From Swiss-Prot:
Source species of the chain: Cyanothece sp. (strain PCC 7425 / ATCC 29141)
Position of the signal peptide: none
Example GO biological process: translation
Description of how the protein assembles with itself and partners: Part of the 50S ribosomal subunit.
Gene behind this protein: rplP
Protein name stated in the entry: Large ribosomal subunit protein uL16
Length: 140
């Protein structure tokens, strides 16, 4: 699973997810992609589950790019612990996703294969998503 090798700080505040994604909202590497339509925290496990679903479906053909990285630690307190005595220990990592963010990209496969692979990955996500395609480039 994805997680940072090292971070400047061990714990982070929760923050807010306002507005749409201003970066990472266009297809950069592949021809097809999965775009988020809602804001959410996507865990490293969910990212990996989506990647596995797509990889299994397309097998040897094509290439997949993961456009998310879980760089935010989420802390949790032990069960049945009294309040106080500081913030809990980091339990897992999440990627903050805003509407418009491209989560996965695929290239080197047909549209039908890409559509099905992206659909399988979308099932693993806790948010609404949509399949997007690169616009055909004008030849000059």
């Amino acid at each position: 699973m994805l997680s940072p090798r090292r971070t400047k700080f061990r714990k982070q505040q929760r923050g807010r997810m306002e507005g749409a994604a201003t970066r990472g909202n266009t297809l950069t590497f592949g021809d097809y992609g999965l775009q988020a339509l809602e804001p959410a925290w996507i865990t490293a496990r969910q990212i990996e589950a989506g990647r596995r679903a797509m990889t299994r479906y397309i097998r040897r053909g094509g290439k997949i790019w993961i456009r998310l990285f879980p760089d935010k630690p989420v802390t949790m307190r032990p069960a049945e612990t009294r309040m106080g005595s500081g913030k809990g220990a980091p339990e897992f990592w999440v990627a903050v996703v805003k509407p418009g963010r491209i989560m996965y990209e695929i290239a080197g496969v047909s549209e039908e294969v890409a559509r099905e692979a992206i659909r399988l990955a979308a099932y693993k996500m806790p948010i609404k998503t949509k399949f997007i395609m690169r616009e055909t480039t004008e030849e000059s």
